[in-house]
C-alpha cells in the first residue's frame, strides 16, 4: 500500500517556527515529535536534523535521543527526536530543522543573545526617583499648611477651660526684647491671628523657683512662650540652674515654647541651649531668622501649631451666653434710649480682658437706633428709669453662665 505509506507526517512539535536566544555556555534541547503512518508495507520512519539546510553531524556540540511508540492497532507510530545543543561557541547559532521522510514542517532558530537592554529599568528608576523627589518637595513646602489645616479641623478645643489668655510671654526687660515682643510678636499673634497674650518682663524663675505671681499668671494662660535672647540667658538661673528651672516649668505648663535667635547658633556653648536641644521632645524650640518677620514665614506657622486651636465665631449669633435669654436690662434703658457710654456697638469688644473676642448683636434683638447727642450725661442721670416690666422678669440664678460656646460654634 504505497499510497498509505506516502501520507505526510503529522508534526506535533515544533508546531510553528521558534526563535531561541541561548547565552554562550548554556545548553538547549530541541524536540521534534510527529505521528507517522505505520504498516507492514511501510518503511520504518527516521528523523534527520538539518542545520542551515545541511545535514547535521552528531557529535561535538550535539547529542541525539530518539523514541518511538506504536498505536495498539499498528496504524501509526509516534516518533520523537530530542537534539541537545551545547552552545559553546558562536558557530552553533543557526536554523535547525527536523525532517521525517524528507518532509519538514517548522524550524528552531538559535540566535545569539544581544546585550541586555537596561533602558526600561533605567527609566523606571528615574521615574521612581522623580516621584520621591516630588513627594519630598511637597512635604517640605506643604507640611506646615497641612498640619495647620488638620489642627483647625480636628484639633483639641481649649476654650472652656477657664483660662483668660492663650499664652504667657516671658522676656527680658531690655530694649531689643521689648521691641521684638511689642512690635513683632504681639501684633502678629493678637491682631493677625486672634490670640490673646499676657506679657511679663520680670524674671521668670528668680532663684530657680516660681514666684506666687508666676503661679497665678501661668494658671490663667494656656501656653508659655519664652523669648530666649542673649539678655534672657544672662540671668543667673539660666546659667547655673537651668535644668532645675526647666523641670519646674514642665510641671507648671504643657510643652513650653522657647524662641531662640539665629545668632545664637554660632555659639552653642550656653548650657541652656544645649539642654533644650537635648530635650526637644519635651519643649517646642523655634528659631527666629531675619526672614521670619514676614507674616507668611514658617516661623509663624510653627508658633500657631504650638498654640491652642482658635475657634471662629459666627458674629450673627451674638454672645452665646445671652443669646437665648433676651437679656435686655430695663435698668440700662432711659425713656427708650441707651445712655451715653453704653451704646450697643457690635464692633467694640465689651469685655476686652475676657476670652470671647468681639461680640456681635444679641440673637433676636433689633438693631440699636442711631445715637443722637441731644441727651447729655447730666440729663441722663436726672431722667426717670422705666421700671414698668420689672415684675415680669426672671431673676432666678443663671445656670448657663459658663456655657460660653455652643456646639454649633465649634
From Swiss-Prot:
Pfam families assigned to the protein according to its UniProt record, in alphabetical order: TIR
Stretches assigned to the Extracellular side: 1-118
Keyword Transmembrane attached: yes
UniProt domain TIR: residue ranges: 163-307
Transmembrane spans: 119-139
InterPro entries named among the record's database cross-references: Ig-like_dom, Ig-like_dom_sf, Ig-like_fold, IL-1_rcpt_fam, TIR_dom, Toll_tir_struct_dom_sf
Keywords: Disulfide bond, Glycoprotein, Immunoglobulin domain, Membrane, Phosphoprotein, Signal-anchor, Transmembrane, Transmembrane helix
Inducing factors: Down-regulated during inflammation by inhibition of an SP1-mediated pathway.
Glycosylation sites recorded in the entry for this protein: 31, 73, 86, 102
Entry's localization field: Membrane
Predominant subcellular localization, coarse grouping: membrane
S-S bridge residues: 32-98
Region span, Disordered: 340-390
Record-level GO cellular component terms: cell surface; membrane; plasma membrane
GO BP, sorted A to Z: acute-phase response; cell surface receptor signaling pathway; negative regulation of chemokine production; negative regulation of cytokine-mediated signaling pathway; negative regulation of interleukin-1-mediated signaling pathway; negative regulation of lipopolysaccharide-mediated signaling pathway; negative regulation of Toll signaling pathway
Lipid bilayer topology: Single-pass type III membrane protein
Sequence positions bearing Phosphoserine: 383
Protein origin, superkingdom: Eukaryota
Expression across tissues: Mainly expressed in epithelial tissues such as kidney, lung and gut.
Residue ranges of domain Ig-like C2-type in the record: 9-109
Cytoplasmic compartment residues: 140-410
Record has Acyltransferase as a keyword: no
Subunit and partners: Interacts with IL1R1, IRAK1, TLR4, TLR5, TLR9 and TRAF6. Upon IL-1 stimulation found in a complex at least composed of IL1R1, SIGIRR, MYD88, IRAK1 and TRAF6. Upon stimulation with LPC found in a complex at least composed of TLR4, SIG1IR, MYD88, IRAK1 and TRAF6. Interacts with PALM3.
Protein family membership: Belongs to the interleukin-1 receptor family.
Protein's name in the database: Single Ig IL-1-related receptor
Organism: Homo sapiens
Amino acid at each position: 500500500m504505497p499510497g498509505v505509506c506516502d501520507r505526510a507526517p503529522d508534526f506535533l512539535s515544533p508546531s510553528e517556527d521558534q526563535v531561541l536566544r541561548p547565552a554562550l555556555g548554556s545548553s538547549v534541547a530541541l524536540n521534534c515529535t510527529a505521528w507517522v503512518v505505520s504498516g507492514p508495507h511501510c518503511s520504518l520512519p527516521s528523523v534527520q536534523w538539518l542545520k542551515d539546510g545541511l545535514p547535521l553531524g552528531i557529535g561535538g556540540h550535539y547529542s541525539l535521543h530518539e523514541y518511538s511508540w506504536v498505536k495498539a492497532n499498528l496504524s501509526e507510530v509516534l516518533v520523537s527526536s530530542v537534539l541537545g545543543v551545547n552552545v559553546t561557541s558562536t558557530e552553533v547559532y543557526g536554523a535547525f530543522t527536523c525532517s521525517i521522510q524528507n518532509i519538514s514542517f517548522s524550524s528552531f532558530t538559535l540566535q545569539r543573545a544581544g546585550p541586555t537592554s537596561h533602558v526600561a529599568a533605567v527609566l523606571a528608576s528615574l521615574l521612581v526617583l522623580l516621584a520621591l523627589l516630588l513627594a519630598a518637595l511637597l512635604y517640605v513646602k506643604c507640611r506646615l499648611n497641612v498640619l495647620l489645616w488638620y489642627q483647625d479641623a480636628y484639633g483639641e478645643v481649649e476654650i472652656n477651660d477657664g483660662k483668660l489668655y492663650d499664652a504667657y510671654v516671658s522676656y527680658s526687660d531690655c530694649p531689643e526684647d521689648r521691641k521684638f515682643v511689642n512690635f513683632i510678636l504681639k501684633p502678629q499673634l493678637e491682631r493677625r491671628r486672634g490670640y490673646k497674650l499676657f506679657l511679663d518682663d520680670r524674671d521668670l524663675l528668680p532663684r530657680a523657683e516660681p514666684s506666687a505671681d508666676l503661679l497665678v499668671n501661668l494658671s490663667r494662660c494656656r501656653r508659655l512662650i519664652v523669648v530666649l535672647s542673649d539678655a534672657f540667658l544672662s540671668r543667673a538661673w539660666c546659667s547655673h540652674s537651668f535644668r532645675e528651672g526647666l523641670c519646674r516649668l514642665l510641671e507648671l505648663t504643657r510643652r513650653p515654647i522657647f524662641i531662640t535667635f539665629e545668632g545664637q547658633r554660632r555659639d552653642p556653648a550656653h548650657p541652656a541651649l544645649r539642654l533644650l536641644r537635648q530635650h526637644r521632645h519635651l519643649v517646642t524650640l523655634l528659631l527666629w531668622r531675619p526672614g521670619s518677620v514676614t507674616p507668611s514665614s514658617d516661623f509663624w506657622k510653627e508658633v500657631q501649631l504650638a498654640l491652642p486651636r482658635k475657634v471662629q465665631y459666627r458674629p450673627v449669633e451674638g454672645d452665646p451666653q445671652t443669646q437665648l435669654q433676651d437679656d435686655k436690662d430695663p435698668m440700662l434703658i432711659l425713656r427708650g434710649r441707651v445712655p451715653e457710654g453704653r451704646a450697643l456697638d457690635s464692633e467694640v469688644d465689651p469685655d476686652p480682658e475676657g476670652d470671647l473676642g468681639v461680640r456681635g448683636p444679641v440673637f433676636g434683638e433689633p438693631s440699636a437706633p442711631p445715637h443722637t447727642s441731644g441727651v447729655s450725661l447730666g440729663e441722663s442721670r436726672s431722667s426717670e428709669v422705666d421700671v414698668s416690666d420689672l415684675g415680669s422678669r426672671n431673676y432666678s440664678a443663671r445656670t448657663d453662665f459658663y456655657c460660653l460656646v455652643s456646639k454649633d460654634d465649634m
